[in-house]
């Protein structure tokens, strides 16, 4: 057992440092092509690259380990200190992805067929997950790899609506202007704004505003973007109509949308992950997350789905991303135990 653990940790160190050295912000996933070709050859896992999103699919089978290869922008030089690995994506989500790749390799060596994906664009508009749902893959079970502290099983995510608003007005000299588009729209923003408070209450948050071209002329045009988040028990149309009513004189456009997801705590993936953690004397927690993930998209394929992964979720998107080799090992072990159970029951 100790020998297996050291083998996994050594392989995880090698692969994760290699992958962290490759800068893959969203839409730049092709930078990792040679890495996945090497994995395919070394671990004898068939490689398929989805043509539209440049997502990477390894292996075969009806069980999918799905993580993502893209990261938020901002390269961090990878390093290792005392079995702690630092780098952009160490937590979100190259650490979980490496755990999944190693688990898939070891499972396939045992004759248990499992696929693993390094999906593209999860940090943006999830074009990788969306392309996967359009392919003829038939997955009975999906485990989504995101950092969940190595103990948490995510069974619910909120949905999101990305909304562009374009407003126009007559420009005037600022010294004698009777109206001002910035002032008028700012009042409406304050009226419609819903601060993120708790999971069950929707949030409407302005994230971008642009207007004006000259120091002494009021703006003729204004661009505004809202990031709307809502739980499965909130009414999507009511939120959109509330914003439309407030900005009646402006043009509105939904530029991206992700539905909320909530799965049964009794579905096979949740139950197998729970038992996998208990077998390691780790107390599992069922949690819900305020953001979104590829699970929101992949729920279209199967209801036997949940999210789990190694890594401290508080470090996501920060410049302090780090993960320990022990965390990755627990991730590998959990994925393997869960899939072995799912395989036996299939």
Curated annotation (Swiss-Prot):
GO MF: cobalt ion binding; hydrolase activity, acting on carbon-nitrogen (but not peptide) bonds, in linear amides; zinc ion binding
Residue sites binding Zn(2+) 1 per the record: 68, 92, 146
Highest taxon in the source lineage: Archaea
UniProt name for this protein: [LysW]-lysine/[LysW]-ornithine hydrolase
Main location: cytoplasm
PANTHER family recorded: [LYSW]-LYSINE_[LYSW]-ORNITHINE HYDROLASE, ACETYLORNITHINE DEACETYLASE
Pathway assigned to this chain's UniProt record: Amino-acid biosynthesis; L-lysine biosynthesis via AAA pathway; L-lysine from L-alpha-aminoadipate (Thermus route): step 5/5; Amino-acid biosynthesis; L-arginine biosynthesis
SUPFAM superfamilies xrefs: Bacterial exopeptidase dimerisation domain (SSF55031), Zn-dependent exopeptidases (SSF53187)
Cofactor: Zn(2+); Co(2+)
GO biological process terms held by the UniProt record: arginine biosynthetic process via ornithine; L-arginine biosynthetic process; lysine biosynthetic process via aminoadipic acid
Alphabetized UniProt keyword annotations: Amino-acid biosynthesis, Arginine biosynthesis, Cobalt, Cytoplasm, Hydrolase, Lysine biosynthesis, Metal-binding, Zinc
GO (cellular component) term, any one: cytoplasm
């Amino acid at each position: 057992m100790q020998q297996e653990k050291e083998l996994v940790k050594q392989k995880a160190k090698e692969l994760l440092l290699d992958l962290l050295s490759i800068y893959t912000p969203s839409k730049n996933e092709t930078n990792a092509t040679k890495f996945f070709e090497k994995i395919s050859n070394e671990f004898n896992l068939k490689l398929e690259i989805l043509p539209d999103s440049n997502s990477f699919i390894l292996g075969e089978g009806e069980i999918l380990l799905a993580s993502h290869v893209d990261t938020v922008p901002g390269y961090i030089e990878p390093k290792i200190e005392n079995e702690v690995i630092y780098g952009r994506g160490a937590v979100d989500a190259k650490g979980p992805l490496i755990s999944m790749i190693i688990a898939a390799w070891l499972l396939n060596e045992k004759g248990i067929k499992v696929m693993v994906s390094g999906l593209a664009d999860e940090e943006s508009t999830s074009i990788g997950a969306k392309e996967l749902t359009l392919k003829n893959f038939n997955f009975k079970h999906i485990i989504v790899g995101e950092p969940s502290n190595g103990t948490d099983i995510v069974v619910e995510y909120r949905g999101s609506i990305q909304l562009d608003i374009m407003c126009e007005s007559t420009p005037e000299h600022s010294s004698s202007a009777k109206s001002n588009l910035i002032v008028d729209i700012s009042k409406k923003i304050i009226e419609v704004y819903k601060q993120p408070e708790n999971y069950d209450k929707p949030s409407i948050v302005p994230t971008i505003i642009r207007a004006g071209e000259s120091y002494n002329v009021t703006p003729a045009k204004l661009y505004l973007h809202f990031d709307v988040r809502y739980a499965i028990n909130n009414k999507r149309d009511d939120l959109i109509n509330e914003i439309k009513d407030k900005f009646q004189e402006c043009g509105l456009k939904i530029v991206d949308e992700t539905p909320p997801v909530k799965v049964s705590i009794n579905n096979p993936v949740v139950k197998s992950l729970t038992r996998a953690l208990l077998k390691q004397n780790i107390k599992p927690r069922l949690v819900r997350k305020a953001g979104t993930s590829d699970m929101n998209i992949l729920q279209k394929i199967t209801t036997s789905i949940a999210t789990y992964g190694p890594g401290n979720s508080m470090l996501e998107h920060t410049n302090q991303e780090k993960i320990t080799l022990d965390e990755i090992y627990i991730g590998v072990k959990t994925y393997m135990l869960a899939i072995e159970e799912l395989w036996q029951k299939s």
